């Protein structure tokens, strides 16, 4: 009699699975074909084709068996090994009617696990965390699935030895197999590489894997939350459903839906609750060979509605657990789920997940694993915390989440001797809820004396639990997803305060061998209990040595010391930690005293206390929904004397970023001069106590300490706020240092607007014109300092600079500098490096050899500006803006200062000096929010290469001799409105112009290039943008006399660029300027005579100055002749 083996056929998610029967007589043929075609199947089942297995029924029973054993596709991470499909498998139970994928269920109904080869090709992993997806696929009658069922394996492989060899083909290297399965499991769920936390050789190794190195929080104002919810279509639905009680009074407006569970007092939120039937204890037996629990009276997680005790959850409207007894068990596909998540949650509340990996080399007993995620604030008050002022440090908690991990709620278990995917256990009964980290209200914030109390709190919670877990050798993976509210503060670092996020883990490791020795009777009748031994991750791994030294701590130590050298409190601790010796097991030999409140333990228990920091980053607002990050443009006129234009690229500036800025000043009166242009960043930091009753400014420690050597330097300043100079252009190096200094050397009377002068009554009168500065401002980032560096830094508010030497210049060893300037950090003026600017077409650009951006100085007449550059590095950078935390406020302003001198119009002729100040608020964000991280690449970056030579244009490729000139070439790097000349001079023929205007002017200028002598030479090299820019001066002159009011002699005189080469340039104003055909630009040469007859005798074929092109365009025969 032939027995039948049920095979579940995958179908659509909205339909029931269809069950077919295959006779056991065909089993041998099926398995033989399965083994022969394994390689072909692994390469042919793509994700697109694999979806067909779950979409339609296969007509062949062979294909049914193939899909049931191998799965319905390949893993997205690997298509070569069969075990790579492990992390995408959908584990089923004994009930084949409820199966989603193809499986060979065991015929033993009493087993709580069975063998399966199911694979789910499309996990629908959107922005919803994967744990909720796994909850939807959870079998409600059991949560564990053991793949290595000996009964089922015997049924499959009893008639064919090929299957036995196929299942055990990884037996040669089980370690590589385990590592590969673990890495694929984590990679499939979006985790990055593992980071080790703790290592005790031959016993236990703990590591962590996170979904991201940093968590990015959106910048969303309270009034924009409703707007975003409105455009996402979830505002009306959110308003109709009130939100349950939360643990914060300052939380965001959290939208909900009719079936969404609300927050309880533990910040426990389940976005996808399942109304499932309570399963019977008979169907929830544990796998004894996978794990064991010493506490026999602990309830099974499956019997508690698939939730653990620490993560217990009560849904709104379902407070009585007996209400769901009569509801039918359902398991829907995520796409067919009736409860949809509002889009506002996905866009405004970022998700974050982390996985804890425990690797055991032997069977070990552990206590419950306590995990906490805390957000802590530390503020050091320089004069004591009011009102008592007994303590200097204020510490409190603004948010926390906690979990309890044990042997029942793991996600994945890989035994130590795992050789195939059939040996791996994945727990689906783990219904760990998704929690939301929010900011606590002022009344619910818990204060603590110092940062050591946080360690004591988690140890007290650990000691309160007496449960133990017997864990077999292997790898245990616990995954924990969380959601962060958008209004919580990001990680902040300031001179007197910190806002940090840390993940803490605590457990007790019990050594069985030591317990047996300790249980024997001792010779002494008096036994003294040993102190508790605690191990931190900093004992073995250098990355976790977090230095939370605050500059205020060092300041208070120096203030309280009376004539003695004050060492920071953390210095002795670090020295004491370095003197500890570690044995071969990585344990410290020093048994320090236990903290207060900790229970006394025997030496057979080792307490593990680990800490992992998290970095939260605030991103700029999205440009698609708000205009907060728009560019800045200022165009104003000061006192009808000076017009200035300022453009800045953006308002949200990443630290260590370079943002372009353009400043243009134009004089409106001739008695005005600009001496200096300075760009600075003003910073203001203020702190408030936890109850908002007391506050102080970051500059108060310096202002209230007359013994500080920088106190007088601070008092003489006009503005007390900190101002970090970023850029400066001046004619003399008389002011303080800046990060980038441009000193102009060829000005007239130290006026940045005048570079030429004219003679009037035997007196040089400067000729003022508009002046434009184009550069990139660099905003330096702060440096995290320890106790040693904090003592060497100047106090906040005093900025010192270190000069950056030019490697191309020889080092100057002159010691003629000022001693006082050396002591306060001023650079030596005698050792300044002068950058000589060559007189070429790029004379207005400075190539910085130190990697900084170029600076362009231009005038309206294109006069060559000679200047040199000095670079300095500040010892203290700028800090982040704080906009989402009222207790710590930090703001910045970009300030542009114009130093202006103006002569009175009266008879006194008194020169008065002014400072025109223009400031605008900016926001400094993290350096991780640079353009390469938050912006998409441009089309040019994706399609072109920087080193690739561009092909010629159509006109350049098809042009012949005597044809019209080619159009201006387009380069993305040289976009400017000045390059787009709309005149017809570029398309007029040379012959036609020479017939109208036989007299041409030969221009000889080094900056504008040589004149065109032959049209054949011009056609040999196509006209480029740089060539076209050099001829704009002549073309502008061609249309400057269209009305015929100016004299024709203007075109027979020298050009301004030629006269600018001389040492003395004068202008004669004795003639009448209103004479017909007279040009005001008649220059007088006092050094040598310039003969204009040479230009009249030379017949040039190039285009001359165009006065009027005529009423009609030229004909083709005129052009080609």
UniProtKB/Swiss-Prot annotation:
The gene is CSR2. One of its GO terms (cellular component) is nucleus. There is a cross-link at residue 841 (Glycyl lysine isopeptide (Lys-Gly) (interchain with G-Cter in ubiquitin)). It is found in: Cytoplasm; Nucleus. Residues 837-846 have a biased composition (Basic and acidic residues). GO terms for biological process: fungal-type cell wall organization; regulation of transcription by RNA polymerase II; ubiquitin-dependent endocytosis. It comes from Saccharomyces cerevisiae (strain ATCC 204508 / S288c). Induction: Repressed by glucose and increased expression upon nitrogen depletion. InterPro entries: Arrestin-like_C (IPR014752), Arrestin_C-like (IPR011022), Arrestin_domain-protein (IPR050357). SMART domains: Arrestin_C. Phosphorylated by CDC28. Its main location: cytoplasm. This is Transcription factor CSR2.
């Amino acid at each position: 009699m032939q027995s039948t083996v049920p095979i579940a056929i995958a179908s659509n998610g909205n339909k029931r699975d269809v069950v077919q029967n295959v006779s056991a007589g065909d089993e041998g043929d099926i398995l033989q074909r399965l083994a022969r075609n394994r390689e072909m199947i692994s390469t042919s089942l793509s994700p697109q084709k694999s979806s067909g297995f779950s979409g339609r029924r296969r007509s062949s029973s062979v294909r049914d068996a193939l899909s049931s054993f191998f799965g319905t596709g390949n893993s997205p991470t690997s298509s070569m090994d069969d075990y790579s499909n492990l992390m995408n498998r959908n584990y089923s139970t004994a009930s084949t009617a409820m199966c989603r994928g193809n499986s060979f269920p065991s015929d033993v109904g009493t087993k709580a696990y069975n063998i399966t080869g199911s694979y789910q090709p499309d996990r629908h992993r959107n922005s919803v965390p994967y744990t909720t997806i796994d909850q939807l696929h959870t079998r409600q009658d059991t949560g564990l699935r053991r793949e290595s069922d000996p009964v089922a394996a015997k049924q499959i492989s009893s008639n064919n030895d090929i299957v036995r060899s196929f299942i055990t083909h990884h037996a040669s290297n089980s370690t590589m197999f385990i590592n590969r399965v673990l890495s694929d499991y984590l990679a499939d769920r979006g985790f990055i590489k593992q980071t080790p936390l703790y290592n005790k050789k031959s016993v236990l190794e703990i590591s962590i894997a996170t979904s991201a190195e940093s968590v990015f929080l959106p910048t969303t104002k309270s009034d924009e939350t409703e707007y975003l919810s409105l455009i996402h279509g979830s505002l009306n639905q959110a308003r109709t459903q009130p939100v349950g009680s939360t643990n914060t009074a300052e939380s965001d407006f959290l939208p909900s839906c009719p079936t969404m569970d609300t927050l309880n007092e533990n910040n426990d939120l389940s976005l996808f609750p399942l109304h499932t039937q309570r399963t019977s204890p008979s169907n929830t037996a544990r796998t004894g060979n996978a794990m064991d629990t010493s506490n026999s009276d602990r309830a099974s997680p499956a019997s508690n509605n698939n939730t653990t005790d620490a993560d217990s959850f009560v849904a709104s409207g379902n407070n009585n657990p007996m209400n769901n007894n009569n509801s039918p068990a359902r398991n829907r596909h995520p796409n067919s789920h009736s409860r949809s998540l509002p889009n506002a949650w996905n866009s405004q509340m970022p998700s974050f997940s982390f996985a804890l990996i425990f690797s055991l080399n032997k069977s070990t007993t552990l206590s419950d694993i306590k995990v906490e995620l805390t957000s802590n604030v530390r503020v050091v008050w320089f004069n004591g915390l009011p009102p008592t002022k007994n303590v200097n440090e204020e510490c409190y908690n603004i948010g926390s989440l906690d979990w309890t991990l044990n042997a029942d709620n793991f996600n994945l278990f890989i035994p130590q001797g795992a050789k195939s995917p059939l040996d791996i256990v994945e727990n689906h009964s783990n219904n760990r809820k998704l929690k939301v980290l929010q900011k606590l209200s002022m009344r619910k914030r818990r204060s603590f004396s110092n940062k050591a109390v946080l360690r004591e709190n988690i140890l007290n919670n650990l000691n309160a639990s007496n449960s133990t877990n017997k864990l077999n050798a292997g790898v245990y993976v616990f995954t924990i997803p969380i959601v962060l509210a958008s209004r919580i503060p990001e990680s902040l670092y300031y001179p007197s305060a910190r806002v940090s996020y840390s993940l803490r883990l605590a457990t007790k490791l019990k050594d069985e061998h030591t317990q047996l020795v300790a249980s024997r009777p001792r010779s002494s009748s008096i036994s003294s209990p040993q102190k508790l031994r605690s191990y931190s991750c900093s004992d073995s791994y250098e990355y976790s040595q977090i230095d939370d030294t605050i500059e205020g701590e060092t300041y208070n130590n120096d203030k309280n010391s009376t004539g003695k050298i004050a060492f920071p409190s953390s210095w002795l601790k670090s020295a004491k930690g370095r003197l500890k010796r570690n044995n071969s097991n990585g344990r410290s030999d020093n048994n320090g005293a236990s903290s207060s409140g900790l229970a006394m333990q025997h030496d057979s228990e080792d307490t593990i206390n680990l800490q992992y920091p998290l970095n939260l980053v605030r991103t700029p607002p999205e440009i698609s929904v708000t205009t907060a990050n728009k560019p800045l443009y200022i165009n104003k006129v000061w006192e009808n004397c000076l017009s200035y234009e300022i453009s800045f690229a953006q308002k949200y500036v990443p630290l260590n970023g370079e943002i372009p800025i353009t400043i243009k000043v134009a004089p409106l009166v001739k008695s005005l001069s600009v001496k200096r242009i300075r760009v600075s960043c003003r910073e203001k930091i203020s702190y408030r106590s936890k109850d908002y009753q007391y506050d102080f400014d970051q500059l108060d420690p310096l202002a209230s300490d007359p013994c500080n050597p920088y106190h007088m330097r601070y008092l003489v300043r006009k503005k007390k706020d900190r101002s970090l100079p970023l850029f400066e252009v001046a004619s003399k190096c008389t002011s303080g240092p800046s990060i980038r200094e441009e000193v102009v050397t060829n000005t007239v009377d130290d006026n940045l607007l005048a570079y030429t002068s004219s003679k009037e009554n035997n007196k040089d009168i400067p000729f003022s014109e508009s002046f434009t500065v184009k550069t990139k401002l660099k905003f330096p980032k702060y440096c995290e300092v320890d106790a040693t560096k904090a003592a060497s830094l100047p106090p906040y508010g005093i900025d010192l600079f270190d000069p950056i030497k030019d490697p191309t210049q020889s080092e100057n060893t002159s010691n003629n500098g000022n001693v006082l300037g050396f002591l306060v950090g001023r650079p030596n003026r005698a050792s300044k490096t002068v950058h000589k600017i060559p007189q070429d077409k790029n004379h207005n650009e400075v190539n910085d050899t130190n990697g900084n951006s170029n600076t362009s100085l231009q005038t309206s007449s294109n006069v060559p500006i000679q200047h040199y550059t000095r670079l300095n590095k500040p010892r203290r950078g700028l800090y982040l803006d704080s906009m989402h935390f009222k207790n710590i406020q930090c703001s910045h302003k970009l300030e542009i200062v114009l130093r202006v001198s103006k002569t009175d119009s009266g008879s006194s002729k008194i020169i008065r000096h002014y400072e025109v100040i223009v400031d605008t608020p900016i926001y400094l964000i993290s350096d991780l929010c640079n353009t390469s991280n938050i912006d998409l690449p441009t089309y040019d970056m994706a399609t072109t290469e920087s080193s690739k030579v561009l092909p010629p244009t159509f006109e350049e490729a098809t042009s012949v001799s005597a044809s019209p000139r080619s159009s201006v070439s387009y380069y993305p790097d040289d976009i400017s409105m000045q390059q787009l000349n709309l005149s017809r001079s570029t398309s007029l023929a040379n012959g036609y112009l020479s017939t109208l205007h036989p007299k041409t002017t030969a221009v000889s200028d080094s900056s504008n290039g040589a004149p065109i002598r032959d049209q054949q030479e011009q056609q040999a090299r196509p006209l480029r943008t740089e060539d076209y820019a050099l001829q704009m001066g002549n073309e502008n002159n061609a249309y400057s006399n269209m009305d015929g009011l100016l004299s024709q002699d203007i075109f027979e005189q020298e050009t301004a660029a030629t006269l600018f080469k001389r040492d003395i340039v004068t202008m004669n104003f004795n003639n009448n300027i209103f004479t017909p055909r007279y040009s005001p630009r008649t220059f007088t040469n006092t050094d040598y005579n310039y003969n204009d007859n040479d230009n009249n005798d030379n017949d040039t074929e190039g285009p001359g100055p165009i006065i009027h092109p005529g009423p009609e365009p030229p004909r083709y025969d005129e052009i080609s002749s």
